A protein has these predicted regions:
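Basic, Lys/Arg-enriched C-terminal extension of HTH/homeodomain DNA-binding domains
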Residues: 196-262
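Helix-turn-helix DNA-binding segment
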Residues: 145-202, 224, 262
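Residue-level marker of regulatory loop/turn positions in helix-turn-helix DNA-binding domains and
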Residues: 5, 68, 155-156, 214-215
Length: 262
């Protein structure tokens, strides 16, 4: 949690939400409940949010996660890069772990450590206001209790996040090794570490562990667990598939030129 910051006057709040009705609701609510922090500055997409935040330096920014042009997570990264003292609340209908992990990594890499909150849009108004007040006035990090488990799980490395997409797209260990410039053994050890993070496994050496290894296809279960927790989504997979198609075209040629098809 960031230390208390003495903000220069005037203080303000930024609301970044692409849904016009929700944006208007938040603007009117916060202007009424926190009059000392007016004006409330509206933004309809992530790019506009970054532009306003870096120009006006609001005390608090409330960012929807899924917005046109730039996601709320990427907007927060751009804002904190120039203005780490700014407090940010992620207000979302889609609390998938792919976003939560990205937020945690950004917070961890930002100096000084920023103050932030993460809350579901379905919360009642009185709880939302208490939540905002804690971040805005007290400088407290606030996580919606419904998602505390997601924030406490082991963070995936860049390779592990990438490997999940490759598993979902059906790549073999051989292909992953070529794509990531690793040995097959290196891929196997890294995937084993990924599986340990994804699964609550049976105690090592027990009959239950032996049974589970026979009963489940680990790669398929990893894909299921990633979907269940929101560690991958269709947009990420479509982007990864397009990038892979270009890589496959280059790698097939290299494979052929190296005489490995014989």
């Amino acid at each position: 949690m960031a230390e208390s910051v003495a903000y220069p006057e005037p203080m303000s709040i930024l609301i970044a939400e692409d849904n016009e009705a929700q944006r208007r609701y938040l603007c009117e609510l916060l202007a009424s409940e926190f009059p000392e922090f007016v004006p409330v500055l509206p933004a309809a997409d992530g790019e506009e949010a970054v532009e306003i935040a870096l120009r006006e330096r609001p005390t608090l920014s409330i960012l929807d996660i899924q917005m046109p042009k730039l996601s709320g997570v990427k907007a927060a990264k751009a804002i904190w890069k120039e203005f780490p003292e700014g407090r940010i609340i992620f207000w979302t209908q889609f609390p998938h772990e792919i976003y939560i992990n990205e937020i945690r990594k950004i917070v961890k890499s930002t100096e000084p450590t920023p103050t932030y909150g993460f809350i579901h849009k379905n919360n009642p108004e009185n709880r939302l206001l208490r939540f905002i007040g804690a971040v805005l006035e007290d400088g407290a990090d606030m996580i919606d209790p419904a998602f505390k488990d997601s924030f406490q799980r082991p963070l995936l490395t860049e390779f592990e996040s990438e490997a999940l997409r490759y598993l979902a797209l059906g790549l073999s260990n051989w292909a992953i090794a070529r794509k990531c410039s690793l040995s097959n053994r290196g891929v196997e050890s890294r995937l084993a570490a990924l599986y340990e993070k994804l699964f609550t496994s049976s105690a090592a050496g027990t009959d239950c562990e032996a049974y589970d290894k026979l009963a489940y296809n680990t790669r398929t279960r990893a894909f299921f667990e990633a979907l269940r927790r929101g560690l991958i989504n269709s947009d990420e997979l479509e982007t990864a598939e397009k990038e892979l198609e270009k890589w496959f075209e280059r790698d097939r040629k290299k494979f052929s030129d190296d005489g490995l098809l014989k």
